[in-house]
Amino acid sequence: NDVMKKNDKAYVIINSTQMKETLVAFGHNEKTSNKILIIGGGNVGFNLAKNIEQSFDEARLKIIEKDKSRAEFIANQLNNTIVINGNGLDEDILTEVNLEDVETVIALTNDDEDNLMVSVLVEKFAKDLKEIDDKRTMALINKPNYSLLQSSLKIDDLIDPRMNTVSSILKHVHKGTIENAYTI
């Protein structure tokens, strides 16, 4: 039928030049974040930072990485990213990175629980600073049941690797004519 109901899925194919207008039409009117904090310097966090450095000159990136040797490696590989060796769950570390200046926090550790907790901590900090609407939190989750916690934990976006895989598959199936696939 032609009626959209709650939990229905719709696929919209558009020209990439219409992306911003389409996202706005679906209620995703978001400004570009220039001050980004990545928690976790594993492959996902490192590659995201590398991609942002190459694509967005205005971006100011910081990465918090627990493992000292990994933090040193990342610091040597990236040109315009500040790398801090520490635990993203440590409130002193979050204070040290000037969390009040950060626009978006992306938790990309290998631990779902840590990613969720970092996001909750950031929301707590933002609320304490009376900046609750100014921070965007994103957390990588591998366990599908954790998506049920998103609204109660007040996390803006959950990153589900399975959905990103769907995006990649769609791009290849349509032989490169799809630039990106988004869940909206």
Language-model-detected regions and their locations in the chain:
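Cytosolic regulatory regions of ion transport systems
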Residues: N1-I184
